[in-house]
From Swiss-Prot:
One of its GO terms (molecular function) is protein dimerization activity. The lineage of its organism: Bacteria, Pseudomonadati, Pseudomonadota, Gammaproteobacteria, Enterobacterales. Keywords: Cytoplasm, DNA-binding, Repressor, Transcription, Transcription regulation. Residues 112-117 bind DNA. Its main location: cytoplasm. This is DNA-binding protein H-NS homolog. A DNA-binding protein implicated in transcriptional repression and chromosome organization and compaction. Binds nucleation sites in AT-rich DNA and bridges them, forming higher-order nucleoprotein complexes and condensing the chromosome. A subset of genes are repressed by H-NS in association with other proteins. Belongs to the histone-like protein H-NS family. SMART domains: HNS (SM00528). It comes from Buchnera aphidicola subsp. Acyrthosiphon pisum (strain APS). InterPro entries: H-NS-like_N, H-NS_C_dom, H-NS_C_dom_sf, Histone_HNS, Histone_HNS_N. The keyword Glycoprotein does not apply. Homodimer that oligomerizes on DNA into higher-order complexes that form bridges between disparate regions of DNA compacting it.
Length: 135
């Protein structure tokens, strides 16, 4: 919560700050709050009406599907199977760097993810640069 909301939400703080203002200013603030609250209520009402309209349309379309002999669940499974067949795994990235690990084995690294400790230490100690490890 930001500072303004903390102040507005605390009655004691409001009382302290209200002592510094005239009654006319407080009444102006009240009127502005009423306007904002009414606008917010209208927005909320509009959103609820849109949700209700959408529910009515969904019910209507469901009844139309059933009248045509189509099970709505069957329709959902058909669309889900299309989406899953469109998904493809991305190919494995080729290695860009090679290095010898602590056990003396040759290893490769794609350049993605954490830098292997052998490469990282060599760069930090300024013994080598990253380009020295290129394949």
């Amino acid at each position: 919560m930001n500072e303004i909301l903390k102040i507005l939400n605390n009655i004691r703080t409001l009382r302290v700050h209200s002592r510094e203002c005239s009654l006319e200013i407080l009444e102006e603030i009240l009127e502005k709050f009423k306007v904002v609250i009414n606008e917010r209520k209208k927005e909320e009402k509009k959103i609820k009406e849109e949700i209700a309209q959408r529910a009515i349309k969904l019910k209507k379309y469901r009844e139309m599907l059933i009248a045509d002999g189509i099970n709505p669940n069957e329709l959902l499974t058909k669309t889900n199977s299309i989406k899953s067949s469109e998904k493809r795994k991305r190919p494995k990235r080729p290695a860009k760097y090679k290095y010898i690990n602590k056990n003396g084995d040759f290893k490769t690294w794609t350049g993605q993810g954490r830098t292997p400790s052998v490469i990282k230490n060599a760069i930090l100690e300024r013994k080598k640069i990253l380009e020295d490890f290129l394949l």
